[in-house]
């Protein structure tokens, strides 16, 4: 796996037309953040901001995962979503 494949997956996810569940969106987001920034480095948002809190928790669950592992998982998840869309 390399940076080019990751960048291609980042572009491909923007082209998806089919429905993607909120849970899948959170997973993809969390692996993207881990791959590009590493461990979550921002304070937890207030519990009243449900969307931001969910995104923070999803990213924070990947703590300790290497950027390369996160890239691999991100690429695999995007491929899975593309296959599901194709039927």
UniProtKB/Swiss-Prot annotation:
Residues 2-87 form the ACB domain. An acyl-CoA binds at residues 29-33, 55, 74. Its main location: cytoplasm. InterPro entries: Acyl-CoA-binding_prot_CS, Acyl-CoA-binding_protein, Acyl-CoA-binding_sf, FERM/acyl-CoA-bd_prot_sf. Pfam families: ACBP. The keyword Chloroplast does not apply. One of its GO terms (molecular function) is fatty-acyl-CoA binding. GO terms for cellular component: cytoplasm. It is found in: Cytoplasm. Keywords: Cytoplasm, Lipid-binding, Transport. It comes from the Eukaryota. One of its GO terms (biological process) is fatty acid metabolic process. May be involved in the energy metabolism of the mature sperm. PANTHER family: ACYL-COA-BINDING PROTEIN, ACBP, DIAZEPAM-BINDING INHIBITOR-LIKE 5. Belongs to the ACBP family. This is Diazepam-binding inhibitor-like 5. It comes from Bos taurus (Bovine).
């Amino acid at each position: 796996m390399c940076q080019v494949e990751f960048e291609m997956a980042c572009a491909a996810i923007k082209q998806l037309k089919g429905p993607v569940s909120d849970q899948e969106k959170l997973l993809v987001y969390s692996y993207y953040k881990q791959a590009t920034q590493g461990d979550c480095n921002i304070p937890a948002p207030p519990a009243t901001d449900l969307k931001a809190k969910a995104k923070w928790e999803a990213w924070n669950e990947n703590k300790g995962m290497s950027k390369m592992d996160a890239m691999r998982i991100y690429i695999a998840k995007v491929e899975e979503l593309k296959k599901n869309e194709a039927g």
